[in-house]
């Protein structure tokens, strides 16, 4: 890992009016996307890796020895998309093959932080599920957490704190070791390391877990849960429960808010931010196309949204690909992107002193 990098010349607001994206090539635009001081709130650390890193893990542990590198990527990942969130979850469970020991988990955390830094992210909230990382090889969640915290801390310090990183804990559904209550207890035990609590995996109505989420929130840990992502669900109950029962401050994805004026009004009134993951939504068939992605409607309606990469390892993308897609297909401007990042900063669960520092530096 080559830490020595040219510092990024981040964009200032006063520069934006002098930049004409329409006259630029795609390569030139990517240089601009990198210079946006990005605040990313929704990225699964356990699914954040490069193709090279993933293949090296598969080879290291002699998994799938009869498959070529390209076949390995096709077998495990979701870069070509699929039929649904359910199909994605099944593939993600396969990816847990690489969580063989604590060394690879620490390495994954290091690479994830460094890659986000190279992409121009200045505030990064990673989230991970202790039970998901642990279940395949029956690892100890305490040692998993130690490895992740150690890996993050080491790279953040090597980068002289030019990227600020925090963790959210996920209690999930969809794999054999999933246990929301155990994950909530783990989150509160390590409250010094976790800035928020989430639910991920299969999208379910969480009202039956109200007691657990109340317990976490009342202990001082804010909530953001996955809801309003899965278009195969017959109604919008997951969103209503997240907002009215769980009292979340943010929603992971939330794009189905666009289907209801009542929900649009509700998230605006309660100042709830939607952590939108554009490429993820298209690849999982939760948005029919980028041209018709609901983020445009939501943004125009005054809903606070932010741009996120979700599971970049599964998609073989990075956060700047999401910016390129939103510009190319939905005509979002640099001013729009700066505003979204200001919203993300405002709604981040990180310490207010760090947020103030980032605001003064970049916004």
UniProtKB/Swiss-Prot annotation:
Q: How is the cofactor bound?
A: Binds 1 zinc ion per subunit.
> Positions of the site: Important for substrate specificity for S-methyl-5'-thioadenosine?
172
Which positions are annotated as binding Zn(2+)? 42, 44, 226, 310
Pfam families from the UniProt entry: A_deaminase
Q: Which SUPFAM superfamilies match?
A: Metallo-dependent hydrolases
Cofactor dependency: Zn(2+)
Q: At which positions is a purine D-ribonucleoside bound?
A: 44-46, 172, 201, 229, 253, 310
Coiled-coil region(s): none
Notes on how activity is controlled: Inhibited by coformycin and methylthiocoformycin (MT-coformycin).
Q: Which UniProt keywords apply?
A: Hydrolase, Metal-binding, Purine salvage, Zinc
- Sorted alphabetically, which PANTHER family does this protein's record hold? ADENOSINE DEAMINASE
Q: What does this protein do?
A: Catalyzes the hydrolytic deamination of adenosine to produce inosine. Unlike mammalian adenosine deaminases, also catalyzes the deamination of 5'-methylthioadenosine (MTA), a by-product of polyamine biosynthesis, to produce 5'-methylthioinosine (MTI). Plays an essential role in the purine salvage pathway which allows the parasite to use host cell purines for the synthesis of nucleic acids.
What name goes with this protein?
Answer: Adenosine deaminase
Q: Which organism is it from?
A: Plasmodium vivax (strain Salvador I)
């Amino acid at each position: 890992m080559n830490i020595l990098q040219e510092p990024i010349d981040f964009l200032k607001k006063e520069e934006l009016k002098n930049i004409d994206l329409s006259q630029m090539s795609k390569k030139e635009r990517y240089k601009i996307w990198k210079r946006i001081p990005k605040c990313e709130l929704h990225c699964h650390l356990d699914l954040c890796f490069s193709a090279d890193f993933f293949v090296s893990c598969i080879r290291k542990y002699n998994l799938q020895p009869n498959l070529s590198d390209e076949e390995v990527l096709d077998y495990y990942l979701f870069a070509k998309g699929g039929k649904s969130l359910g199909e994605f979850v099944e593939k993600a469970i396969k990816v847990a093959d690489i969580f063989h020991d604590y060394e690879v988990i620490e390495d994954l955390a290091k690479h994830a932080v460094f890659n986000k830094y190279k992409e121009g992210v200045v505030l990064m909230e990673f989230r991970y599920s202790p039970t998901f990382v642990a279940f395949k090889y029956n690892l100890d969640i305490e040692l998993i957490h130690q490895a992740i915290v150690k890996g993050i801390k080491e790279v953040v310090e090597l980068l002289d704190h030019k990227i600020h990183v925090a963790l959210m804990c996920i209690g999930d559904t969809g794999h054999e070791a999933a246990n929301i209550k155990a994950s909530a207890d783990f989150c509160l035990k390590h409250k010094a390391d976790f800035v928020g609590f989430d639910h991920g995996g299969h999208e379910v109505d969480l009202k039956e877990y109200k007691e657990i989420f109340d317990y976490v929130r009342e202990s001082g840990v804010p909530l953001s849960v996955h809801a309003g992502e899965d278009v195969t669900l017959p109604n919008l109950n997951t969103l209503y429960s997240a907002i009215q029962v769980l009292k979340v401050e943010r929603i992971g994805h939330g794009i189905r808010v666009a289907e209801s004026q009542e929900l649009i009004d509700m998230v605006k009134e309660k100042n709830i931010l939607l952590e939108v993951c554009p490429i993820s939504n298209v690849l999982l068939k939760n948005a029919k196309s980028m041209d018709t992605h609901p983020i445009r409607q939501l943004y125009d309606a005054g809903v606070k949204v932010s741009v996120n990469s979700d599971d970049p390892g599964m998609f073989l993308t990075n956060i700047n690909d999401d910016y390129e897609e939103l510009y190319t297909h939905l005509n979002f401007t640099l001013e729009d992107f700066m505003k979204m990042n200001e919203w993300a900063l405002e709604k981040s669960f990180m310490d207010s002193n760090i947020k103030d520092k980032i605001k003064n530096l970049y916004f």
